């Protein structure tokens, strides 16, 4: 029996994608091979690879000024790879810290430069807001400005993206990429692990403006140097072939759904239903300012936290899984990525109301 999976990542995949992958597992398109067995330089995998790159460009409307790369290491690795590729001769990078992941990025950058905290969304209640651009205090000559546009743990999503002029804007988009249209031209670099909205764990997407490819530090490993990866069409070393294949199937699924505009409308509907349920109750609480609440990751707390384990057990009995909040913040978290259907959110909301009544 399939359940409703609210995991923050690795996360739910579209059932259509899983079924297609199952059908093609032993024999991809008459090749007599599984994608797992293919040479990454053979014509069969090259067709998968090129189609995935092209479909991602189409979905995000990536301009010709930017390169799309497939790497490995996830968002965590990019916290080191970004400074190694962008610092050049500069010694400072600016960070807008809106949650746990941008804090990790800030901390990792200390190994390579002197990071400057340009703004923070931390309050007495934790990370609950995204500082407006007017609050940002940028340094004099930063190599780049970094932000995480959706904080998976804290549930803070940044929607207003400023124009920084000549300063490259770097965004960790791991947990909301492909959930809504984006103006890619505003960014110098976008990066994200695949295991939330793109596909399965193993591949990392990097979209980088081409004029930024000449800034890498000499210590940057060649496999992570964007210029080298770009020059080799993301095939400098053996890529995560099956993860790219699954990502390609997800891209095709998204196109069949009507693209990112249609997906965004669905995601708004799902998020509104869940937040309205939380806000309409004194039993559940979300601490994030409404204007910057994440559409993808919805943390919430029970007024009586002694009931947390009962809540999770009851949810599991109804086929609602992976609702436990991150260990650093506690409570609950429902990750409602693209592949989580509206029916899943409706089932969760119904359970939340039933549980509240039972506890009254």
From Swiss-Prot:
The compartments listed are: Cytoplasm
Q: Family per UniProt?
A: Belongs to the class-V pyridoxal-phosphate-dependent aminotransferase family. SerC subfamily.
EC number(s) reported in the record:
2.6.1.52
List-wise, which residues carry N6-(pyridoxal phosphate)lysine?
196
The reactions it catalyses are: O-phospho-L-serine + 2-oxoglutarate = 3-phosphooxypyruvate + L-glutamate; 4-(phosphooxy)-L-threonine + 2-oxoglutarate = (R)-3-hydroxy-2-oxo-4-phosphooxybutanoate + L-glutamate
- Cofactor(s), by name: pyridoxal 5'-phosphate
Q: Which InterPro entries does the entry mention?
A: Aminotrans_V_dom, Aminotrans_V_PyrdxlP_BS, Pser_aminoTfrase, PyrdxlP-dep_Trfase, PyrdxlP-dep_Trfase_major, PyrdxlP-dep_Trfase_small
Q: What is this protein called?
A: Phosphoserine aminotransferase
Recorded GO MF terms: O-phospho-L-serine:2-oxoglutarate aminotransferase activity; pyridoxal phosphate binding
| Superkingdom per UniProt | Bacteria
User: What is the UniProt remark on how the cofactor binds and its stoichiometry?
Assistant: Binds 1 pyridoxal phosphate per subunit.
Which Gene Ontology cellular-component terms appear in the entry? cytoplasm
Q: What does this protein do?
A: Catalyzes the reversible conversion of 3-phosphohydroxypyruvate to phosphoserine and of 3-hydroxy-2-oxo-4-phosphonooxybutanoate to phosphohydroxythreonine.
Q: Which UniProt keywords apply?
A: Amino-acid biosynthesis, Aminotransferase, Cytoplasm, Pyridoxal phosphate, Pyridoxine biosynthesis, Serine biosynthesis, Transferase
Quick one: which residues bind L-glutamate?
A: 41
Keyword hit for Signal: no
Task: Tell me the enzyme class.
Answer: transferase
Describe, as the record does, how this protein assembles with itself and its partners.
Homodimer.
Entry binding sites for pyridoxal 5'-phosphate: 101, 152, 172, 195, 237-238
């Amino acid at each position: 029996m399939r359940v409703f999976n609210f995991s923050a990542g690795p996360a739910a995949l579209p059932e259509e994608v899983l079924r297609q992958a199952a059908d093609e597992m032993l024999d991809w398109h008459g090749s007599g091979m599984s994608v797992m067995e293919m040479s990454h330089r053979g014509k069969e995998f090259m067709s998968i690879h090129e189609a995935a790159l092209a479909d991602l460009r189409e979905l995000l409307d990536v301009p010709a000024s930017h390169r799309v790369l497939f790497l490995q290491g996830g968002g965590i690795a990019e916290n080191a790879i970004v400074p190694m590729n962008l610092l050049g001769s500069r010694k400072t990078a600016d960070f807008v810290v809106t949650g746990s992941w941008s804090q990790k990025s800030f901390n990792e950058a200390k190994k390579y430069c002197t990071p400057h905290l340009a703004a923070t969304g931390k309050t007495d209640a934790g990370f609950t807001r995204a500082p407006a651009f007017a609050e940002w205090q940028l340094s004099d000559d930063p190599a780049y400005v970094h932000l995480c546009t959706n904080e998976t743990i804290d549930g803070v999503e940044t929607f207003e993206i400023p124009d920084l002029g000549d300063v490259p804007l770097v965004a960790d988009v791991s947990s909301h990429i492909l959930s809504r249209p984006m103006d890619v031209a505003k960014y110098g670099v976008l990066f994200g692990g695949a295991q939330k909205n793109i596909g399965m764990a193993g591949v990392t997407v990097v979209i980088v403006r081409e004029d930024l490819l000449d800034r890498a530090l000499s210590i940057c490993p060649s496999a992570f140097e964007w210029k080298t990866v770009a020059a080799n069409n993301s095939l400098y070393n053996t890529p995560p072939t099956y993860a790219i294949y699954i990502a390609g199937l997800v891209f095709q699924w998204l196109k069949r759904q009507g693209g990112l505009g249609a997906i965004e409308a669905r995601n708004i509907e799902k998020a509104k239903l869940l937040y309205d349920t939380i806000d309409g109750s004194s039993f559940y609480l979300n601490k994030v300012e409404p204007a910057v609440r994440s559409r993808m990751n919805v943390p919430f707390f029970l007024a009586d936290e002694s009931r947390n384990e009962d809540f999770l057990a009851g949810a599991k009995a109804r086929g609602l899984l992976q609702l436990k909040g991150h260990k650093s913040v506690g409570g609950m978290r429902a990750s409602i990525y693209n592949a989580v259907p509206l029916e899943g959110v409706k089932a969760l909301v119904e359970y939340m109301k039933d549980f509240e009544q039972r506890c009254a």
